[in-house]
Amino acid sequence: MSCKKQRSRKHSVNEKCNMKIEHYFSPVSKEQQNNCSTSLMRMESRGDPRATTNTQAQRFHSPKKNPEDQTMPQNRTIYVTLKVNHRRNQDMKLKLTHSENSSLYMALNTLQAVRKEIETHQGQEMLVRGTEGIKEYINLGMPLSCFPEGGQVVITFSQSKSKQKEDNHIFGRQDKASTECVKFYIHAIGIGKCKRRIVKCGKLHKKGRKLCVYAFKGETIKDALCKDGRFLSFLENDDWKLIENNDTILESTQPVDELEGRYFQVEVEKRMVPSAAASQNPESEKRNTCVLREQIVAQYPSLKRESEKIIENFKKKMKVKNGETLFELHRTTFGKVTKNSSSIKVVKLLVRLSDSVGYLFWDSATTGYATCFVFKGLFILTCRHVIDSIVGDGIEPSKWATIIGQCVRVTFGYEELKDKETNYFFVEPWFEIHNEELDYAVLKLKENGQQVPMELYNGITPVPLSGLIHIIGHPYGEKKQIDACAVIPQGQRAKKCQERVQSKKAESPEYVHMYTQRSFQKIVHNPDVITYDTEFFFGASGSPVFDSKGSLVAMHAAGFAYTYQNETRSIIEFGSTMESILLDIKQRHKPWYEEVFVNQQDVEMMSDEDL
């Protein structure tokens, strides 16, 4: 379609409509409300990098009309419920009949009640979630032809925290090769080390939330997600894939034709920055080096600021201009802080101990994963907050054990992707030993004829005051890994937190403003936890923590994490000590403790002498 024709299809703006949403959707005029077959408005080029929105749809369905096909489009009926806080429209179910060729947003705007709510919630984002016939959070650009007859949706409004550009537009769908619509679902939280967040809307970035993505047959998976408009822009350039049921991989280049009704997670692969191609002309390469460096630094303001600080620091401290002083300064500034090497004996011991570390996963109201380990006999230990994620919100505690027994599985052999969910154990419908304050929970494996790995408990070993520790777990739901990290002594916790908060504020103030010194008071003086630096974040909760000799000393629980440039970073991480967990079990669950630990001597955990 020519630009001239595109402009001829634009309609006047209804100034009474929500101005924020108008940036993405053209309001429906009274003439359009009475004409179900009205063509769609405002078509923009797909290649326009400005054409992005926060959570609203970016694609309208506007099929091309052939001269021989002049029949009137059929209507489609859906039911709309307004979930708003005032009585006027609260929980009203509205019947909506409109042309199936129109988008959901255009159809909704024919309802006076919806238009009033848009006007009432100016500056907020409208979210539409399917409840019957179609599920999850729906793209407002989806054509009604994709909806089943009689489908039901619920409308809510979310306060927008992002600042949208004034020139944002919506996309037309003139380039589709097929009129057959395919709907599939994407979990709002991605998996993988590099980028956990994949959606723009903060309200959608929660566990259990899923987005209904629509596409047309012949399009690729990457086309569908990038054109959807609700996902972050890195999906256009980075390498990623879809994971189905934790055992099937679909690359983003695959067609969407067979994806109808299926659920996926987005796994983002670590993006490697390609090295610059070698210059054909060495002299030209030399001439361009300085210019290239300046261009790179200009793209990263924080890098430029930090480099200027380092240079200024060198100028202040370098009083003696000799090579020895310069070497000492470099060694002090950039040298390693903590030795993280281990003897071969300890490494071999850790490999043996890793056999008892399990990948715990579930599929209930939500899906998720965590880490656990064999504690004693058939009993495994994990974090209490993991149980909260498994059972979901609003469930009676009396039903927790049943839910756990139905949906939780554990495998100890997940060291390669093919072994992710093989040879697993179910757990008993039993949930009695736990503590929310210390964040631990004991579950019991259900015997199935497989050999249970050796128990890791072999007495109480005090946590090290400093030095090196090892964490074994499944961060981000990935294959089993070991992380060697440094203990932050209790006396240095407050100072370390303060230093890191200040440094993060200087680097990226908008990302760490939610943390203050008060945020860390709960762990700064808490003797029941051990603090350390680690790159184990989501999915590693419940990982055993070993000292430098291979003795079990704690269980990794949580940390103060934040997201910067789509990457997860941390101020400080911590875990509950085994000494505190055992003492709490002995005091609060004495009968169980005596039954399970009777006649067990408090001997040291396996050490390198056992090899």
Curated annotation (Swiss-Prot):
The keyword Metal-binding does not apply. Pfam families: Trypsin_2 (PF13365). Induction: Regulated in a cell cycle dependent manner with the lowest expression during G0 or the quiescent phase and with peak expression during G2/M phase (at protein level). Upon virus infection via the cGAS-STING signaling pathway. It comes from Homo sapiens. This is Serine protease FAM111A. GO terms for biological process: DNA damage response; DNA replication; negative regulation of viral genome replication; protein autoprocessing; protein-DNA covalent cross-linking repair; proteolysis; replication fork processing. It is an enzyme of class 3 (hydrolase). Residues 44-73 are annotated as: Disordered. The record marks 334-335 as: Cleavage. Belongs to the FAM111 family. The gene is FAM111A. Keywords: Autocatalytic cleavage, Chromosome, Cytoplasm, Disease variant, DNA damage, DNA repair, DNA replication, DNA-binding, Dwarfism, Host-virus interaction, Hydrolase, Isopeptide bond, Nucleus, Phosphoprotein, Protease, Ubl conjugation.
